[in-house]
UniProtKB/Swiss-Prot annotation:
This is ATP synthase subunit beta 2. ATP binds at G145, G146, A147, G148, V149, G150, K151, T152. One of its GO terms (cellular component) is proton-transporting ATP synthase complex. Pfam families: ATP-synt_ab (PF00006), ATP-synt_VA_C (PF22919). SUPFAM superfamilies: C-terminal domain of alpha and beta subunits of F1 ATP synthase (SSF47917), N-terminal domain of alpha and beta subunits of F1 ATP synthase (SSF50615), P-loop containing nucleoside triphosphate hydrolases (SSF52540). The lineage of its organism: Bacteria, Bacillati, Mycoplasmatota, Mycoplasmoidales, Metamycoplasmataceae. It is a peripheral membrane protein.
Length: 468
């Protein structure tokens, strides 16, 4: 039993007798189990420094009694957790029956690495992702964007579209909410229940109003559960994080509270090791795979922010959301020229796909170069060849807009799951000029892949009638 001796911000110095000094990582209980601290550092034979994990109704005061639980974070694991929501301490946040097996956080870390050579493509049904940023099982995907451009909607759509294609007996889905809004977690849970996907999903949530210690530790807790599912249950894991930037932000707050010297842009000096410690665990083993999807908040929409760069270095693919594209009313607002994937290889997606991506990017890049000239002179002043490029680029930009299932409650329009082969056929026809006579606006939010051919046939029919 110890006593709180000093406190500031979310950091507390707690004194114990010499023979009762707790270990680093142990959880301390205060105020009859209403408040919890985690031992971060041992200062002397009798003094430890701890960070706040959970606060009760009353603030922690000097001389408050702290009891060493002699345990670290206990993580609920196993099939019984399907459909359950947990906090960082493993407490159940929703009504869910059953007893849970628990393992200690980080006890599932494996040094064994297994490189997946199967290159199994995961189709998301989202045209712009499946075309520009293909996803394979066991890869890491980052979704970068500033505030309010649709990161959370996209990650919810990915959960919905990918999960419903997989056999729930072979796949386990984890969602880790790191410092985001309570409302978003509640909406996601309701949507998972309504779509019957909750039966293979576990959620670990630390909300934005919780202490920085909780927001930082929730990610290792969620990863521990995912590693257990991969290795002990031999599942293929889909691991979704919203928002991994908040994990690093919480680390920055803790570093400041602990009095550590900051580095570039005010971030903690341990920024690189903090992100490496979690990213390296999101890997495949001989028992199963972990495919991770991570939203990344961009402060001031800056891709060069040190936290964003640190995260980007660990990813196989990155989706970059654009405020300009969002303002044009095109959704998902993904910028295909800024987004990239190391998985866009001929041996993975095929020669035809690679060549089409190169052709489309060439058209979009040329269009971007012409934009300033168009603003000054207008499209009609361009050379005929450039006018053709502009028309194709505008058709392509609109073609990649898509109604999403998770946005249907806002748009009042049903979602659409795109077939990859049909999409490639249509894109090839667009770049070949097969649809060049169709107005650009007709390409917006297309549903069925047959629509463009129908529109073209109707236009040709109208032209013949006018000629006659």
């Amino acid at each position: 039993m110890g006593k709180v001796k000093h406190l500031w911000s979310d950091v507390y110095d707690v004194e114990f007798s010499e023979n009762e000094l707790p270990n680093i990582g142990n959880i301390l209980s205060l105020q009859d189990g209403k408040c919890f601290l985690m031992v971060e550092r041992i200062l002397s034979n009798t003094l430890v420094r701890a960070i706040l994990i959970k606060i009760g109704e009353e603030q922690i005061k000097i001389n408050d009694i702290a009891i060493d639980t002699k345990e670290s974070f206990n993580v609920p694991v196993g099939s019984a957790t399907n459909g359950a929501i947990f906090d960082v301490l493993g407490n159940l946040l929703n009504e869910h029956p059953g007893d849970f097996k628990k393992v200690e956080v980080d006890s599932t870390i494996s040094t064994e690495k297994h490189f997946n050579s199967d290159n199994e493509i995961i189709n998301t049904g989202i045209k712009i992702i499946d075309f520009f940023v293909p996803i394979i099982k066991g890869s890491k995907i980052g979704i970068f964007g500033g505030a309010g451009v649709g990161k959370t909607i996209i990650i919810k759509e990915l959960i919905f579209n990918i999960s419903r294609q997989r056999d729930s007996n072979d796949v386990k889905v984890f969602f880790v909410g790191t410092g985001e809004r309570t409302r978003e977690a509640k909406e996601l849970y309701d949507e998972l229940v309504n779509s019957s996907l909750i039966k293979s999903t576990s959620l670990f949530i630390s909300q934005m109003n919780e202490p920085s210690g909780s927001r930082m530790k929730i990610l290792p807790v969620g990863i521990t559960a995912a590693e257990y599912a991969r290795d002990s249950e031999q599942k293929d894991v889909l691991f979704f994080v919203d928002n991994i930037y908040r994990y690093l932000q919480a680390g920055r707050e803790l570093s400041f509270s602990l009095g550590k010297k900051p580095s570039e842009a005010g971030y903690q000096a341990t920024l690189v090791s903090d992100i490496s410690s979690v990213q390296e665990r999101l890997a495949n083993s001989k028992h199963g795979s972990i495919t991770s999807f991570q939203t990344v908040f961009l402060p001031m929409d800056d891709l060069n922010d040190p936290a964003s760069v640190a995260i980007l270095n660990h990813l196989d693919s990155s989706l970059v959301l654009s405020r300009e594209i969002f303002a044009e009313g095109l959704f998902p607002a993904i910028d295909p020229l800024l987004s990239n994937s190391s998985l866009l290889q001929e041996k993975i997606v095929g020669k035809r796909h690679i060549l089409l991506v190169k052709r489309v990017k060439k058209i979009l890049h040329k269009y971007k170069q012409l934009e300033e000239m168009i603003m000054i002179l207008g499209v009609q002043e361009l050379e005929p060849n450039n006018r053709l490029i502009v028309k194709k680029a505008q058709q392509l930009k609109n073609y990649f807009s898509q109604n999403l299932f998770m946005a249907s409650s806002y748009t009042k329009k049903p979602g659409f799951f795109a077939d990859k082969e049909e999409m490639l056929d249509e894109i090839e026809k667009i770049v070949d000029g097969h649809y060049i006579d169709i107005p650009e606006y007709k390409f917006l939010y297309l549903g069925s892949s047959k629509k463009l051919d129908q529109i073209k046939a109707n236009l040709e029919k109208d032209q013949k009638e006018q000629e006659n």
